[in-house]
A protein has these predicted regions:
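A helix-boundary/hinge signal
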Residues: 1-245
Length: 245
C-alpha cells in the first residue's frame, strides 16, 4: 500500500540528502517506520493508508506502541495537530535496534560504550559460576564476541574499544576477578590463532570488524541499484564509484 501510494505520488517520504532517493518507509521483522513531511495533510494521507490496511487485513494499529518523531524545525502547533490525529506520543529518539541507537552522530564512542557495558554485565554473571575451559570457550565465542557483530556490520569501532573488549574477555578466560590478578600464560594474539596453529580460534575483533565491513562493501559493489547503495552514493561519493570513495 505504501509503495502504491508512493508510485501514485500520494506519498513522497523524505530524502537523506540532496540528490538522494526519497524514502517513504522501512520495514523490520516486528516494526515499521514511515517517513513523511511534517504536515497535517501528510498525516491525513498516512492515517488513510493505515485505516485501509486495518480494514483489509483485520489487524489493528497498536497506538500504545506507536510513536511520532519530528525534526527540531517542526513548529509545536503542527506537532500537536499530528499527535492528536494519530493519538500517539511524541518521542525525542527511537528505541535501539539490536543494541544500536537509530541516530549515531560524530561522537560514536558514546554510542559504542553500550557494547562494552553489555559484555561486562554478561561476564560478571558468568564469573559466579563454575565453568570448565570448554564452557568458557563456548560463552566467549557464542555470546561475548558475538555481541558487537551488528554494530561492526555498520561501523568501524575504535581500536581502543577493541582492546577493552579483548581485555574483558581475556580476564574471563584466565579466571581473573576484580580484586585479584592471574597470569596470562599466552598472549591474546596467539589465542586468536586457529586451533591448528596452537591458538583457541577466538576472534581478532579488529580483523573481524574489517571483514564484516568488507563484506558490506562487496554487497554495495555488486548491487549498485540497491537502495542503500544509491543513498550512500548520493551522500558520500556522488561523482565517483564505491572503490574510489
Amino acid at each position: 500500500m505504501l509503495q502504491r501510494d508512493e508510485a501514485d505520488n500520494n506519498l513522497r517520504g523524505i530524502p537523506v540528502c540532496r540528490g538522494a532517493p526519497w524514502i517513504s518507509h522501512l520495514l523490520f521483522p516486528d516494526d515499521c517506520i514511515v517517513f513523511c513531511k511534517a504536515s497535517v495533510d501528510e498525516g491525513h494521507k498516512i492515517t488513510k493508508i493505515l485505516e485501509k490496511y486495518e480494514k483489509e487485513s483485520g489487524q489493528k494499529l497498536n497506538k500504545e506502541k506507536t510513536s511520532l518523531f519530528f525534526s527540531k524545525n517542526t513548529i509545536r502547533e503542527v506537532q500537536e495537530a499530528v499527535k492528536d490525529m494519530f493519538g500517539a506520543e511524541i518521542i525525542l529518539q527511537h528505541e535501539r535496534y539490536l543494541g544500536l541507537p537509530p541516530l549515531v552522530g560524530r561522537g560514536k564512542r558514546k554510542a559504542f560504550n553500550r557494547i562494552k557495558d553489555q559484555v561486562r554485565r554478561k561476564i560478571a554473571c558468568w564469573k559466579g559460576k563454575l565453568l570448565s575451559s570448554a564452557g568458557r570457550e563456548i560463552l566467549i565465542k557464542a555470546v561475548a564476541q558475538a555481541t558487537p557483530t551488528y554494530t561492526m556490520n555498520c561501523f568501524k569501532i575504535p581500536d581502543s574499544l577493541c582492546n577493552e573488549l579483548n581485555s574483558l574477555i581475556s580476564n574471563f578466560w584466565w579466571g581473573q576477578r576484580e580484586k585479584e590478578r592471574k597470569l596470562a600464560w599466552i598472549s591474546w594474539e596467539k589465542m586468536c590463532k586457529p586451533k591448528a596453529e596452537g591458538g583457541m580460534g577466538f576472534k581478532d575483533l579488529r580483523a573481524f570488524n574489517l571483514a564484516l565491513l568488507a563484506k558490506q562493501g562487496w554487497r554495495l559493489f555488486q548491487n549498485p541499484g540497491s537502495l542503500i547503495h544509491r543513498i550512500l552514493k548520493s551522500r558520500y561519493f556522488p561523482d565517483s564509484n564505491f572503490m574510489e570513495a
